[in-house]
Amino acid sequence: MRFGLNIDHIVTLREIRKTYEPEILEALFIAKNTHKVDLITIHLREDKRHIQNEDVLRLLEISPLPINIECSINAAITDFLCSLKNKPSKVTIVPENRNEVTTEGGLDCSLKGLGEVIRAYRNKGVEVSLFVDPLKDSLHFAKEHQVKQVEFHTGVYANLHNALYSNANNQIHAISALKDKSPKELKEELHNAFLQLRKMSKEAFFMGITACAGHGLNYSNVKELLKIPSLRELNIGHSVISKAVFVGLEKAILEMAQLIKR
């Protein structure tokens, strides 16, 4: 299983104060020196709430690890990424909403202009991945547009697991739709969410599409996904950076890697 480390929230901390620290390149080399991280993931948002264009340029210039850039189909961002001398190893196209706290679901594959953006990256020799819900229609769209990789949105699975097996439902930001569900209901829905991820990962494999996954994964809920042999990559960020606040980034990375690289 490949481990993609999302370092957006290193930059979130920097941007809150509009200062120079923490330094994103230090995070990059801490990750590299663990010898456990396979790629670095960053999200270049339209609103630039964390990662900035300059961060992209600096990372691509010196990174010893592959860089996966998440982004919307925004024309300015597409033009910027297509113009780069140093190319990312892949671009993952994601949905985006300025009012969201984080990505709320998979990409709508009927989105106008999506096909053109895929072709624009392909013409520049950049691999494209689509961040999608684990649905067959999304896989058929990827196949039709010669996209060889998808990343399944694991938010539904992760939220259900957290509601059932952690104190998430008692926290200030508990998900209201899950608070009133019984443990039996949560367990059944969690099981179905896992089965859907497993089914679509297997479907992707038989279609010649590499299946990755990410969103909301943490040290507790990631373990079950290791039972899906056709999943090839997990992208994890917030949970690792959160733990790093208390134990340091190196240890936080190593603890996650120990779980997903058994």
Predicted regions mapped to residue ranges:
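Alpha-helix-loop-beta-strand connector modules within alpha/beta enzyme cores
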Residues: N33, R49-A75, C109-S129, A174-C212, ...
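Catalytic cores of alpha/beta
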Residues: N74-K87, L135-Q146, A211-A213, L217-L231
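Histidine/lysine/aspartate-rich catalytic loop segments that bind and position anionic ligands
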Residues: D133-A193, M200-E203
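Active-site mouth loops of central-metabolism enzymes
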Residues: F3-L25, P66-I73, E100-D108, R122-P134, ...
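Conserved N-terminal beta1-alpha1 strand-loop-helix module at the mouth
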Residues: M1-N68, N74-N86, E144, Y165-Q171
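Glycine-rich phosphate-binding active-site loops on the catalytic face of alpha/beta enzymes
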Residues: V91-E100, Q149-N162, S230-L249
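Hydrophobic faces of well-ordered beta-strands that scaffold small-molecule active sites
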Residues: F3-I7, I40-I42, I67-I69, S89-I93, ...
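C-terminal helical cap(s) of enzyme catalytic domains, especially alpha/beta-barrels
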Residues: N162-L178, S242-R262
